[in-house]
């Protein structure tokens, strides 16, 4: 019986030693795997960090946003590499859904939502002042609210900024400055207050500059000097800081 017990104990000891060797090997392999995974994770952090740190700005508007010498170009340069500025302007379009060219029926509107912006700049209303569009003026407020609500449903939960329309003078398009100043602006102000949004006054800085210093020949669209003024005011609305002075502001 003693020999049997001794034999049993000896077998148990041998099994235990063998077990320890196996466990040691497993631990060594696991340590190597963990080190590889940690290294891979650390290598991925810088790439992920850049993507996550980009603040996306969606510029919604008409030809003043989309066209030549547009303000999003210098705005992007002012903001720098931490920002991504998307130009979603559409030439000749209206905020009004019953307008002759409604912005909210365009691919640009859909793409702006897919962009998942962190900030949305709404600069629409100039083309709405035309007689054929302003006959639907009673719907301007609800349409502006609809656009705001649509962007607020984006997963990115963007900050929304409304821009007061810039002034216009005598022109061939039927754009009426008195409508922009006396009818559209009060609605923009009312909606901004209702939704607790920032309203950027782009009218006042250009009110006495509807000439060759800031506008092109048609008295509606801006040249580089005028667009630079817009970019500076919108930059301040986004960052709370004064815009930096740039050389070659319109170079992409």
Q: Residue spans of the language-model regions?
A:
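Active-site segments of SGNH/GDSL-like serine hydrolases
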Residues: 123-127, 150-182
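N-terminal secretory targeting modules
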Residues: 1-60, 64-73, 77-82, 113-118, ...
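Catalytic His-Asp segment of secreted/periplasmic serine-dependent ester chemistry enzymes
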Residues: 166-252
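Short glycine-/small-residue-rich flexible loop motifs, especially phosphate/cofactor-binding loops
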Residues: 73, 148, 189
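Conserved beta-strand segments of alpha/beta enzyme cores
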Residues: 84-86, 159, 196-198
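Residue-level detector of flexible, active-site-proximal loop/helix-junction positions
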Residues: 44, 64, 92, 167, ...
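Generic structural signal for well-ordered alpha-helices
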Residues: 144-148, 185
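Conserved SGNH/GDSL esterase-like catalytic core that processes O-acyl groups on lipids
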Residues: 53-59, 64-142
